[in-house]
Amino acid sequence: LPCINEDPTIVVRTKVLPEGLPKSVKDSKNEVEIVEDKGGFYDIHVNALIYYYLLEASKLNPPILPLWLSPVQVRVIPVKDDFVQKAIEIAEALRAKGYRADVDDMKEGLGKKIARAGTEWVPFTVIVGEREAQTGVLTVKVRERNEQRQMSLEELLELLKGNETSVSLIPLRISERSG
């Protein structure tokens, strides 16, 4: 990870400090305040806060961001083109409940798609094949525990509960992203 930005420019001002928020972050070269007490209110330096979470995540095996901070919370991967539509339905159902989900519809093998989700630190990866399409029981890779589980969409929603967002700004299909 790069060195801490010594002059964070994004600040959130609040009267009530969220519980458990770190006060500062220190790497091998610098220590930067995350929270400044301004007497009656607090300034939270967002750049330093995000750096803190990246630094902490990089210490984990596998590395993982808090679910609320992950750009993509759930990646849905069809095992072949026949299941892209089912994958889209699952991702749209997750988005409708306020979660950041996308579909890896690239013309690549399953292994590459799973590896891509891993390099992007996606917390939950849903694999959709014939069995999942027929039974509705999803195969879900849970990054934090490095395990694969079978669960319904409702059970996945229960795992995600409390991490809803207002809108996903990420295109539904990976193939629709630029670059």
Regions found by a protein language model. Give the residues of each.
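TRNA-recognition modules of translation machinery and tRNA-sensing kinases, especially anticodon-binding
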Residues: L1-Y99, D104-M106, R131-G179
